[in-house]
Every structure is written in C-alpha cells, then in structure tokens.
Amino acid sequence: MNLQMIGTGNAFAKKYFNNNALIEQDGFKLLIDCGITAPLALYELGIGMEELDAVLVTHTHGDHVGGLEEYGFQMKFKHGRRPVLLLPEALVDPLWQNTLSGGMTQEGLEKLEDAFDVRALRVGDVQELAPNLCVELVPTSHIAGKKSYSLILNRDVFYSADMTFEPELLTTLVRDRGIRRILHEVQLEGPGAVHTTLDELLSLPEEMQSIIKLMHYADNKEQFVGRTGKMEFLEQGLVYPI
C-alpha cells in the first residue's frame, strides 16, 4: 500500500495544499478527503480526477470537502458518471444539506446520490474497498457538535482526521489493535483547542513517537524540523510505502 499526500497543510496553509491523501493499493486509487485545493493538487501531480476509484470523507470542513463540488461536476459533465463517495453514515445528510446543495443543486442534481455513488460506512465495520484494501472508522473529537472520523487502513495503519489529543486511544490502538504506523495531524504552536499540538505528541513515549508521521501542519513547518522528537514530517507529493 502506497501513500502520497497530495497536500500536507492545515486549513490556513498557503505553502502547502490541504491535508488530503492518495492511497494506492494494487492499482486502486482512494483519495482521503477532497479539500478546496485538491483539484489543483491532483493536477500538479499529473493525476486526473477521473483516475480516482473512490473518495473517502472524514468530516465536513472545507479543507476536507471543498473540492467535492468540482469533482462531482467534472465526473458528471466531462466523464458521464457518478464517482464513488465513501463517508460515515452520519455525514451523508449534513454533507449535502449544509455544504454541497447550495452550489450543486440544479435539475437532476437534487440530492447527494444524484451526483455521487454514495457508500455509507458504519462505525465498527471493517469495509473492504478493494482487494487488499480495507478501512475502519474511528470516531475522534474535533469540533463540539460536529462528527469527525479517523481511519484504520488495512487493520494496522492509523490515519488521523482533524482531532484533539487522545493518548489513551493511541495507546490502545498500538497495544491492543496492532497498529504499526500512525499518520497524525499536528498543530505546531499554541493551545490545542480543536487539534493535537506538537507538545502533546512529544509527551508520548519515544517508542510510540517512532511510528508517528506528522501532517496537517502550518506554513512555518521548516522552523520545527529537528524539534519533533522521534517523529518525522510527511512531505507533500512524496510516495511512501506504508
């Protein structure tokens, strides 16, 4: 399984695209989140949106879903098909009603299922997306009153959505679930009201830090190189075997 971060930036980053990830397994391409910058990020990597086999949404903030309108329109009007959209069942209605309907509603496009081949995912299920690729939702805390879901990929890789610090969850995943790699969002400075701070992650045991890769960072990331303990930054555009 290969990981390519088409973007590694937080919602306000300008040097980096939105934190969205391309997972490829045996030719199957899964995009985790499709933020505002995703269409341009894919273009600059030479990847057409029509090459994606599915998009999976973790939560409904713009840096994670803001590119879905263009994706849906491109696929409908240029390629004549509804693309596969995977998302937690609790997000199906809010994604359309609160985010996409204003820009996408027109004759023949009156609900999410008109634009996308919607595949609702349930918490607790391990969903096989393709041969040798499965995903499990993990509810995690981000914004009060807004649901957000991190992911377990192929049973042993934890991919964090935007989330506050949950050390007990991370410990349980590693100790009891056999997680061998953690791809974790990070807020480099300030208090972690809705994100996990670097200082919080540095409080983890070094053994756990050594399996963590950092993403969703700010434009001043270069100032923190060498200051992340045993953790390393994921770099935008590079392909990592995971």
Swiss-Prot record:
One GO molecular-function entry: hydrolase activity
Reactions that this protein is recorded to catalyse: 3',5'-cyclic CMP + H2O = CMP + H(+); 3',5'-cyclic UMP + H2O = UMP + H(+)
Binding of Zn(2+) 1, residues: 63-64, 162, 216
Known cofactor(s): Zn(2+)
Transmembrane segment boundaries: none
Matches recorded under Pfam families: Anti-Pycsar_Apyc1
Top-level lineage group: Bacteria
Keyword Metal-binding: yes
Segments for region (Beta-lactamase-like): 17-216
Binding-site positions, Zn(2+) 2: 59, 61, 142
Cofactor: how bound: Coordinates 2 Zn(2+) ions. One protomer coordinates the metal ions and the opposing protomer provides the catalytic residues required for cCMP hydrolysis.
Keywords: Hydrolase, Metal-binding, Zinc
Subunit structure: Homodimer.
Other notes: This homolog of an antiviral immune evasion nuclease may be due to cryptic prophages, or it may play a role in regulating the endogenous antiviral defense system based on cyclic nucleotides.
Role: Counteracts the endogenous Pycsar antiviral defense system. Phosphodiesterase that enables metal-dependent hydrolysis of host cyclic nucleotide Pycsar defense signals such as cCMP and cUMP.
Homology family: Belongs to the anti-Pycsar protein Apyc1 family.
Full protein name: Anti-Pycsar protein Apyc1
